């Protein structure tokens, strides 16, 4: 394999998810020289850590980039980031540089701080203020501290510029995303001159199989356009 895609997922999920599996199957079936690498975020899936911090996500992402380039000897590296994965990918570009040939983001969580603080109860805020943890998550419960929220607040990707990467980027955003407002993503894309594909009637996870198939096709065509 000469071309490798690093695929990342959203908060509270796991690398063993059907969306990534379907993407990998279709990509590899069509282009034999492609491969897909996935990994678990800190305190997600099979990872051994208990606490979750965005800066640790950055470290995991960077370790994976170096492993793919140096250990797997990939000639071309691509990024496919979903939700939290999209946020971390955007941070990586401005904080570490761009090792990717092309970058596709599906419903990137550009407003992740706003999302995460929106449902904090007064009781939970008291816990955080006292240095204690609160719990969030789906398939696995994740422990969050005030440091988690502080790191998100300090690294707002909406305040960064992505002009240098825009020619090689694509964003797919659902018009009915219940967490990430479509208009906010559209404004982000316009401000940074990034190509945006509005996906009509798509919710945050792209739960409609037909809509997910369309999104996967668009991303594969972006990574490997037909000659």
Q: Whereabouts are the PLM-identified features?
A:
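Short, surface-exposed "cap/lid" segments of acyl-processing enzymes
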Residues: 2-41
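Short, surface-exposed alpha-helical segments at coil->helix boundaries
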Residues: 17, 21, 55-58, 182-186
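Catalytic nucleophile-loop/oxyanion-hole region of alpha/beta-hydrolase
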Residues: 42-74
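The alpha/beta-hydrolase serine catalytic core
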Residues: 52, 99-198, 203-226
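Gly/Ala-rich beta-loop-alpha elbow adjacent to hydrolase catalytic centers
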Residues: 81-85, 89
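Active-site signature of alpha/beta-hydrolase-fold catalytic machinery across serine-
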Residues: 91-95
């Amino acid at each position: 394999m000469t071309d490798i895609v690093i695929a990342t997922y959203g908060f509270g999920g796991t690398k063993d998810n059907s969306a990534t599996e379907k993407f990998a199957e279709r990509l590899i079936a069509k282009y034999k020289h492609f491969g897909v690498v996935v990994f678990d975020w800190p305190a997600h899936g099979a990872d051994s850590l208990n606490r979750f911090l965005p800066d640790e996500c950055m470290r995991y992402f960077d370790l994976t980039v170096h492993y793919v380039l140096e250990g797997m000897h990939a000639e071309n590296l691509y990024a496919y980031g979903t939700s939290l994965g999209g946020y971390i990918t955007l941070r990586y570009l401005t904080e570490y540089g761009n090792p990717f040939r092309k970058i596709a983001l599906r419903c990137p969580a550009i407003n992740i701080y706003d999302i995460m603080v929106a449902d904090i109860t007064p009781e939970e805020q008291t816990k955080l203020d006292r240095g204690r943890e609160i719990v969030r998550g789906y398939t696995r419960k994740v422990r969050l501290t005030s440091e988690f929220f502080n790191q998100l607040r300090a690294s707002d990707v909406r305040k960064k510029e992505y002009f240098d990467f825009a020619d090689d980027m694509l964003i797919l955003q659902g018009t009915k995303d219940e967490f990430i407002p479509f208009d906010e993503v559209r404004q982000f894309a316009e401000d940074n001159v990034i190509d945006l594909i509005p996906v009509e009637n798509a919710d945050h996870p792209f739960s409609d199989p037909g809509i997910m198939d369309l999104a996967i096709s668009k991303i594969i065509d972006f990574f490997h356009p037909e000659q």
